[in-house]
Amino acid sequence: MDLSLQLQIHGALINKGPSCTSYWASSSSLSLPRDFISSSTFLLHRRLRRRSCSRSRGIRLRRSGFSAMPCSSSDTLTASRVGCGGGGGGGAVGGGAENASVANFKLNESTFIASLMPKKEIRADCFIEAHPEYDGRGVVIAIFDSGFDPSAAGLHVTSDGKPKVLDVIDCTGSGDIDTSTVVKANEDGHIRGASGATLVVNSSWKNPTGEWRVGSKLVYQLFTDDLTSRVKKERRKSWDEKNQEEIAKAVNNLYDFDQKHSKVEDAKLKKTREDLQSKVDFLKKQADKYEDKGPVIDAVVWHDGEVWRVALDTQSLEEDPDSGKLADFSPLTNYRIERKYGVFSRLDACSFVANVYDEGKVLSIVTDSSPHGTHVAGIATAHHPEEHLLNGVAPGAQIISCKIGDSRLGSMETGTGLTRALIAALEHNCDLVNMSYGEPALLPDYGRFVDLVTEAVNKRRLIFVSSAGNSGPALTTVGAPGGTTSSIIGVGAYVSPAMAAGAHSVVEPPSEGLEYTWSSRGPTSDGDLGVCISAPGGAVAPVPTWTLQRRMLMNGTSMASPSACGAIALLLSAMKAEGIPVSPYSVRRALENTSTPVGDLPEDKLTTGQGLMQVDKAYEYLKQFQDYPCVFYQIKVNLSGKTIPTSRGIYLREGTACRQSTEWTIQVDPKFHEGASNLKELVPFEECLELHSTDEGVVRVPDYLLLTNNGRGFNVVVDPTNLGDGVHYFEVYGIDCKAPERGPLFRIPVTIIIPKTVANQPPVISFQQMSFISGHIERRYIEVPHGATWAEATMRTSGFDTTRRFYIDTLQVCPLRRPIKWESAPTFASPSAKSFVFPVVSGQTMELAIAQFWSSGLGSREPTIVDFEIEFHGVGVDKEELLLDGSEAPIKVEAEALLASEKLVPIAVLNKIRVPYQPIDAQLKTLSTGRDRLLSGKQILALTLTYKFKLEDSAEVKPYIPLLNNRIYDTKFESQFFMISDTNKRVYAMGDVYPESSKLPKGEYKLQLYLRHENVELLEKLKQLTVFIERNMGEIRLNLHSEPDGPFTGNGAFKSSVLMPGVKEAFYLGPPTKDKLPKNTPQGSMLVGEISYGKLSFDEKEGKNPKDNPVSYPISYVVPPNKPEEDKKAASAPTCSKSVSERLEQEVRDTKIKFLGNLKQETEEERSEWRKLCTCLKSEYPDYTPLLAKILEGLLSRSDAGDKISHHEEIIEAANEVVRSVDVDELARFLLDKTEPEDDEAEKLKKKMEVTRDQLADALYQKGLAMARIENLKGEKEGEGEEESSQKDKFEENFKELTKWVDVKSSKYGTLTVLREKRLSRLGTALKVLDDLIQNENETANKKLYELKLDLLEEIGWSHLVTYEKQWMQVRFPKSLPLF
């Protein structure tokens, strides 16, 4: 997801619970990438989704539980401290005389405009003023994001007139269209498009081969949710007008009929009136059922002898029938060749780009998946010739767009997108990458994408810049990859007074610059600093044209990263022009050693990194030290005596480790870029380093170190015993003795957190009289008492005037887990109090971070006084995860309260079922070389696994893949993607590492899982990968007992108890009773749910759901084997009156008939053999109804008959043979006898007669269908002659015969009723019956019914409904599955 911030949207809360549950934005808002915040003028509307602790799909939002607010309001998000001096633009960094008073800070028109696109803070403006030709010229930046709009303001040309955008690529595959189908044009220049539409190609288009490749796509699959919403609204308005017009006509027709016939007694007139009424009712009903799935666009691809060309037919998007025609389209080719783009229609105003891959077999239509990417690109490089103050940081740089935010997933990044983007960046020889996306990670500096980036940085000298995250203000909240990867420059978000006053339009700006409140902080869990540098984290920058505005305000580390990236482009522009060697190692060192520190305390570096970057100083540094080796100093830290784990810094935060001296081994390994000369660079490398500690009283280091190419180790002693409570930050760094002015060559962060212990009983800790102003943060560290599992907190505020908004975070770091974080963003009036409940991990240090939002309270002179009290509670159990093994035995659970007396109220509920599936097919293939060849030259392979499952009823299902889910950066697997489709190939769900539930109707489904990697052995191991299909079920509440036999005897029910401190108490958890288990559950399935034990101290209600209680734990039950079915043949000794020879003859006959049914009829030869066997069997078993029914079934299975009229006549004759073979009188007499059978023979006879009835009815039904189709094929009209009239009488005669045996309006036979009404020109009645049939279909959609509906609508002339149904046909019955 990307890294943008959270907003308060029209007062709608975005709430996130303690366990990181899903959160949503209000319908008036748009979810933004995790690093950015949208402006008040255009809010993106999207579902915000949790990814572990703070993840939204494709786009990162800062937090949940926080009231998201438009960034331009006075309550805009931001926080921490940082500022920049200079000319009234940036604001001061830290304190001092330079800080102008708030009262004296004023903007004029020019400084206001400049504040919208901040550059002064990082001194980019003065650098360009001093070096106008070093404005990014000669530098190419790859923007890894949601894609950007090449037509957006400022993204057309560079400052020196070159094309701004070099390429636009969809790396996700979300815009891919299968164009492998080849067609030829007829003599009129017509071709059939993939949608079935007839298209006219332009005669002037060059196509030497005459081959046209066709494909199609629903256009909403290319649009963002917000654009789709806008287009739907406009289309609905137009559709409603047309529908209302047709309703008026239908009502008038009914009125005219009633005026002519005051009394309707004649049966025929009654039917006529019913038909007119049905039309009115049908049209009204359509308005309620309307659901716009979007127009279909047809795509045509051809080779003009030089390049691949693309044209689209977008008539379905246009109101004007003469607009959007294929022949009028100006053909495009791959963007990088001609740099041209198209616009779908005037309605959407959405720009797109076309790229052709795989020799024309794949067309990629590239659109952005959110405005985020365009905004990011604008901050980095926009050029506005008419207003230079609105320029991006590097207006002379060129860019390529690498879309990693998948449109199918709401702009979530995918492994496929990330890998392809890196391949594209290297193919284009990009100098820089900006990536404003990220996720929480289990392990820092780990994973496949991290490995690929590190390889590119080392081998190709690629400089990779990324956002640090928006999960602050707590420490250890940096996200992957930006804040956790050594080879990536991670950027925090800073706001200056000028930005606050101008871009955010606050009433009164802060007196000095500061870090936004939500900007993520370090260190990483392995001790690395996390944030490298800071840069302005907000801007009013360009957005796509489909937003119907030129620019908007967004803020987040998503905005800070391109600001820094653009600044680095200025440095590279100068370095290239002046011949200074370019290396990510030297550039990073220059940035870190020249940044302006923000704040006065050492631990401020955990917030801002080395400080606010300064372009001019970094440039001077690079010039001065250009002759020194380009070396990266890799740091490996181990606790003495231990080889694992290896970390990149020293991070002490748990009680024991923080209260004793420890010795650490530091290994420093210089790393050169690949290709460095052994003799000229590696062997001569030798540096005499002076080692320093920022506080020798705490961190002691050797004085000197001689470092050579093979590296060197040294020891460090850390003594925290004299430190007070709180966070303490130190650094160990190495200085070149011969050139100390170079500054630190490497730094080793040392973070020590000394927690408070909670000694009193009951365990309560309080923090009194804390004083807050805007942006102020108070951090408290508490050693969570052993035995605590949750905490109840109260925050009291007073002493202020206007309302105050706060961020409250708690965070704990546990081994091999993502940081455990709880967060809330309450608003307080004065005085007021609020209570909170959050889970805790026993014995682990917990950070409590309380921050007054950076813009909250600006303009007020009154500080906020806060009292915060935490009371710890806990019910500990001997097993946190419970597994019931499927037997009848209960599980014993021991509970204990170590802190104080607690209520023990266990509640156990199973509410989901997980069914395991193995793949029925595994296809491994090599992908095309165009997009999927790595830097190493290795070709990526794809493994497609196919699974089948069936739902007996509609249900919400979610795929669950334990090996792969919930990890995108911190995994060695490259990519995963799944889609779920029905037997019609309609796709119901798509997903990746974070699967979500999807509502599916009853039916059979296919899940295809797509995995990518270049390692064939790894993919081979996954060919039998187990996938679980999880679905909701009715709650099963498990019983609790105080004795082991309780589940059987029903005695000793356990309800509740009071746990005394230190006294254990046990109870038994019984398995569910067999009658409560879901029916037809396969063996190996699991029922899953939650169990809770404790209860809130202030809650007197009886909780019925474990999730209502403070802490819940997973519980699962293995479904036991089903009861074996009895052998019915063995159980009942059959009494048969037939002789052995008669039974043998019967078995032979039935076997022959079965064999006939299994014969294929695909070729003429096979059909001839089938007919011969039919003739032979009919002569052998004359008038045997099951045989004749099987022959009729065989005829119906042939769908490719050449002469359709002859085929239907053959069906009629076969049906007649079935009808003639049945003694209808005997059958009628038997069915009228309702006596229940009393023996086996009578039961068999009853079943036989019922089968015969069904065969008779089916024959009559198929005969009627065939007769109707013959009439349709011949184009007969009512009253065309005696022969036709006689044929109609035969149809009616057949229909009336069918009504004697079955309900002709039932789902099985209703189609014939529809055709009958159609023949009688009662089209409204026909539609009513057909619509009822479709509504009653509770399984996979029947294509023939929808085709019949389309025919009826076309015959009536309701063109708006015809168009609507044709679009739905593309959804329900696509010709093939979409590409991955």
From Swiss-Prot:
Top EC category: hydrolase
Q: How is its activity regulated?
A: Inhibited by alanine-alanine-phenylalanine-chloromethylketone, butabindide and phenylmethanesulfonyl fluoride (PMSF), but not by leupeptin, N-ethylmaleimide, EDTA, MG132 and lactacystin.
Q: Gene3D superfamilies, alphabetically?
A: 1.25.40.710, 2.60.40.3170, 6.10.250.3080, Peptidase S8/S53 domain
Q: What happens when the gene is disrupted?
A: No visible phenotype under normal growth conditions.
Q: Name one Pfam family in it.
A: TPPII_Ig-like-1
SUPFAM superfamilies attached here?
Subtilisin-like
Q: Which CDD domains match?
A: Peptidases_S8_Tripeptidyl_Aminopeptidase_II (cd04857)
Looking at the record, which segments are called Disordered? 1099-1143
Per the database entry, which stretches of residues form a coiled coil?
1152-1181, 1238-1300
What is the induction note for this entry?
By cadmium (at protein level).
GO molecular function terms noted in the UniProt entry: aminopeptidase activity; mRNA binding; salicylic acid binding; serine-type endopeptidase activity; tripeptidyl-peptidase activity
**Purpose:** Serine protease of the proteasome pathway that may function with the 20S proteasome to degrade oxidized proteins generated by environmental stress.
Q: Which PANTHER family match?
A: PEPTIDASE S8 (PTHR43806), TRIPEPTIDYL-PEPTIDASE 2 (PTHR43806:SF14)
Q: What is the annotated quaternary arrangement, including any partners? A: Assembles into a large oligomeric complex containing two related proteins 153 and 142 kDa that are derived from the single TPP2 gene. The 142 kDa form mainly differs from the 153 kDa form by a truncation at the C-terminal end.
Protein's name in the database? Tripeptidyl-peptidase 2
Q: Which organism is it from?
A: Arabidopsis thaliana
The organism's taxonomy opens as: Eukaryota, Viridiplantae, Streptophyta, Embryophyta, Tracheophyta
- Underlying gene: TPP2
